[in-house]
Amino acid sequence: MIETTRPELVAYQEERLAKFVNENQKLDKGQIVFAGDSITEFFALKKYLGRDFPLVNRGIAGTDSVWLLEHLKEQVLDLEPSKLVLLIGINDIGRGYPIRDIVNRISDIIMTVRQESLLTEVYLLSVFPVSEKSQYAAKVKIRNNASVGELNQQLAVLPGVTYVDLYDYLTDAQGQLNDTYTTDGLHLSPQGYQVLAEPIKKEILE
């Protein structure tokens, strides 16, 4: 089943974006910005990554590369980040977009940041695995690891960005998103975020 965006989710997204616009006037420039969808939004950055880093969470649930490209200024660029950590694409797969189109939009996001915010280092996280087990089908819908793997293979060679591959940290012996690390086959549990903390600190923050 292809995922559609419900009106109440759109209202939430617009409300969260408006909150960002208001915050942009007050926040210091040059912080480390994490941008993406719900997996980023639900990432309690200071809890898992510590308070030694100037971290800003700019995740918005239910968004995809179409949304992020359209709202990049308000969500990211106005903060003039020292580093940008991107995690986007799983909802594009959920909406049935061709892999080639997803890659092109993410490439456009990266190039726009590099042109508009010259001092920003851009890091692109691999799209995370899902669990294709039957109990998670209602949430995961048409998302699948074959598509995620195809997308990641192309994201890994994009120019102008540091690609950070976290995929295997989250998989079980069958290559699925580990039950311990997920709440619903798609989103991460506290244990899932915890297992990513050290590689993110090592590869990006330190």
Where are these predicted regions, by residue range?
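Catalytic His-Asp segment of secreted/periplasmic serine-dependent ester chemistry enzymes
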Residues: I2, P129-E206
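Acidic/histidine-rich helix-loop elements
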Residues: T4-P7, D52-S65, G185
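A short helix->loop->beta-strand "cap" motif at the edges of active sites that frequently abuts
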Residues: S117-E121
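Oxyanion-hole/transition-state-stabilizing segment in secreted/luminal serine hydrolases
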Residues: E41-P54, V66-N104, P129-S131
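Charged helix-capping and loop-helix junction motifs
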Residues: I99-I109, N144-G149
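N-terminal secretory targeting modules
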Residues: M1-A35, T40-R51, L205-E206
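A short acidic, glycine-rich active-site loop
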Residues: N57-V66, K141-G149
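Structural beta-sheet core signal
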Residues: F34, L86, Y123-S126
